[in-house]
Amino acid sequence: QTVQRLSPNAVVQSVACDEPDDFARPLHIRCDFAAPRFVLGDGQQRMLALPMLQTIFGDRTLSDLFGQTGPAERKYGLKLWASRRALFEETIKLPAGWTVKKLPEAVDMDGPSAGLHFKIESKEGEIQYTCDLIIKNWIVPPADYANFKQVMEKFEELTGRVVTCEREGGHAQR
């Protein structure tokens, strides 16, 4: 059901997950899935959202982070559930004949309360990326809030970025 939030056509091929309620160690999820008709657009070019950056597995681990960056500054510390690291690693296999025309830019931010590192590359029918979101404090002090705000706004921006693809030979077909 979780993967179908990406697309009603998504089909899980395999999944492996640690115990999600064991907070003594990192949570690892590996999910192989196919999502036919996941791309947007018609004609030669298509737009592809980065699936795992839609944070479909983030219900228990990231939901308290979103919507916390409204004010420009804070008088009091911002309380979060916990400090944490969310590392997204994904490989997307493109259909035969597709090439990548434009990738989102890399991001490398670090500060006293949060960090964000995003790298993406394409090669021979695949797109590979890593996105490392690090929340260093469970209470973000007012002096460090600007860093937290900047990192979270950039992360939220990344969740909406797309990869532009093109079908070799000039015509994209479904």
Each PLM stretch: what is its role?
Residues 1-174:
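A sensor for short, sequence-defined functional sites
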